[in-house]
Amino acid sequence: MGLDIYAGTLTRYYSHNWKTVVQQWAEENGYSFNRITPDGEPADDEELSPTDVQAAVENWRDQILAAISQPDQPPYAPWPENNEKPYYTDKPDWDAFGAMLLVAACRTYEEPVPPTVEKDWIFGEHPLIARLASDEERVWSLFRGATWWLPLTDSFLFQGPLPTDDTVAIATLGGLRKELERLNQLAWQADEDTILGWADTEGYPVDGTVDSDGQYSKADIPEHTQYDTQSLAKFAFSMFWRAMRFAEEQQVPILLDY
C-alpha cells in the first residue's frame, strides 16, 4: 500500500477529480490502472455529484472551523472549496516518509543518522522515532500521526472527524511549515531551490526500465533491499515542501492518501 501526498480542495479529492502520479504515468504510457483501498478492495466509483460533495465538504469545513476558533478571537476564515482549483500530488511512499522522520529524530537527539534503511521497514518502531513521537516537549504533527493539514497560519494539532466520519489527527499548514523549516535547519540548511529539486534528483534507486515498446523490465537490475537514508529523506522532504508551498499559495488543505 503506497503513500501519496495531495494538496488541493477536498471537493476535488472526494469527487475523485484528481489522479495520482502513478495514474498519470499509466495513462501517458497506455497502461490500465486500478486503485486499491487499504482493505484490499478496488476503489469504489459510486460517488455523489461534485455539487453534493462540495456542499458536504463546506458544511464539514464550517463546523470544524467553528469548533477550533478561539474565544475572544476572530473566527477562522473558510478556505475556498470547488471542483476546479488546481491540485498538487506526488508519491513519497512509506519508506521515504519514514526516512524523513528518522533524520528528524536523529538530528533532534544528536544521534548519528543510519546510512541505510531496509525496504518496507517499520519505521514507527525505531527507538528514536518512537521517542520523538511521545516527547511532550517537542510536538511534531508529522510524528503524532497527522494525515491532514488545514490552510491556517496558527499552529495546533487535534483529533477530529473527517467528512467521512473517520477520526484522525488534523494539523495546520502553519504548523507544518515550522516543522519543515526546523527539520531543514537541523539536517541540511538547504536553500529553497535545492529543496525543491530533491524530488527530481534524490529518492529510490531504479528497479526496472521501460523499453521502446513500453514494456517494463527488471532484467539485469538487482532488486534493492536497502535504501540510502539521506536520499530518501530529502526526496520525501522535497515533496512535503512542494505541497506546503502549493497549499499556501492556493489556500487548500494537504492530506496523505493511502
Where are these regions (language model features)?
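Acidic (Asp/Glu-rich) sequence patches and key acidic residues
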Residues: 1-242, 246, 258
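Short helix-adjacent coil turns
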Residues: 248-253
